[in-house]
Amino acid sequence: MTIKNFTFFSPNSTEFPVGSNNDGKLYMMLTGMDYRTIRRKDWSSPLNTALNVQYTNTSIIAGGRYFELLNETVALKGNAVNYIHANIDLTRTANPVSLSAETSNNSNGVDINNGSGVLKVCFDIVTTSGTGVTSTKPTVQTSTLDSISVNDMTVSGSIDVPVQTLTVEAGNGLDLQLTKKNNDLVIVRFFGSVSNIQKGWNMSGTWVDRPFRPAVVQSLVGHFAGRDTSFHIDINPNGSITWWGESIDNTPIATRGNGSYFIK
């Protein structure tokens, strides 16, 4: 058993006993990177000249390895989508990093800090015509973290969350279309035509599946189509559904509307 490669302890106060592999792991752990993601900063904008892109002053971290592109030029293919890759080969001690323009994203996720091989990471996507560059799109810089706690957050794009759907035949002609977002919010659409139900009855059909059940009773309001009247139902923590609309005889009345509730 061995514990080594401390980043906080220098026995003689003159050396830093951490190798480049360990330093690479440190970068990746601090930023939530994996071997298919990058960090990139253009200190000055790349230049596009004919079928060439020149990275005038760009910093990149890939596989935890930091390097700089200073007036580095990549030849592009015409009438194509060019995926610009950084290739890190630690066996090439004089020039361990090279750039290549390829016709697809060939990022390979090779673990160069614990094993061997050449790491390929795409960091730019450049589209060309027959004579020059028509568009550029840097690769998204992604972090993977277990939990984030922030005091304030501004989002300019979209937030993607897991989505599940469920259709519940609640009984007595009432149907519910449930859409759950990120195990937090459930959006409910009412449809179907209700009959043979009394106020306060538990509905006779299917209960709500466990993943969609609220922690406390949730009351949702819908309306009867073509009428000026509404109804509400309770979705109970055990999944049962209680009708709190008017009592309805055997003549069906169409329902419409939407509601929502938080699971927790």
From Swiss-Prot:
It comes from the Viruses. GO terms for cellular component: virus tail, baseplate. GO terms for biological process: cell adhesion; entry receptor-mediated virion attachment to host cell; symbiont entry into host cell. Coiled coil: none annotated. It is found in: Virion. Pfam families: Caudo_bapla_N, Caudo_bapla_RBP, Caudo_bapla_RBP_neck. Keywords: Host-virus interaction, Viral attachment to host cell, Viral attachment to host entry receptor, Viral baseplate protein, Viral tail protein, Virion, Virus entry into host cell. Residues 164-264 are annotated as: Host receptor binding. Binds to the host phosphopolysaccharides at the onset of infection. Upon activation by calcium, the receptor binding proteins change their conformation, presenting their binding sites to the host, and a channel opens at the bottom of the baseplate for DNA ejection. Belongs to the skunalikevirus receptor binding protein family. The C-terminus is involved in host receptor binding. Host-recognition domains point upwards, towards the capsid. Homotrimer; found as an assembly of 6 homotrimers. Interacts with host phosphopolysaccharides; this allows the virus to bind the external cell wall layer. Interacts with the distal tail protein. This is Receptor binding protein.
